[in-house]
C-alpha cells in the first residue's frame, strides 16, 4: 500500500504534467481521473469497502489540491466532482521551466515530469516532483532546509 506522501507525489505529478503541457490553458480535473468518482455504487452503499477506499482517495486528492494552492503552485475553482479552471502560478511555471543540474540537454523539470507521466514511470515522476518542490522551498528560505 502506498503512503500518503507517495500518493501526493503521484497526484502532483499528474497535475503538473497536464498543466505544464497545456499551459496557459486552464484545465479541469475530476475524481474520475483517479478512479474515485462518486457513482451510483457509492450512493447505494456508502459504507462498502470500495466506497470508503474511494473516499480516502478523494480526501488525499483534495488535500493535495489545497496544499498546492496554499503553497502558491496552482490556482483553481473547486466543484462537487473535482476542480475546474486549474492553472499553474508564475512560481510553478518558473520552477517547471528550470533545467535539472543532473541532466544534460534541454529538458526542463516540466518536460521530465510530463514524459515520465506519459510513460507511466511513476518513480521518475515522483523524484522530479520532489526536486521541484524542494527547489522552490529552498529559494524561499534562502537555500536552508
What do the PLM-derived regions correspond to, one by one?
Residues 83-116:
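Short, amphipathic alpha-helical interaction segments positioned at domain boundaries
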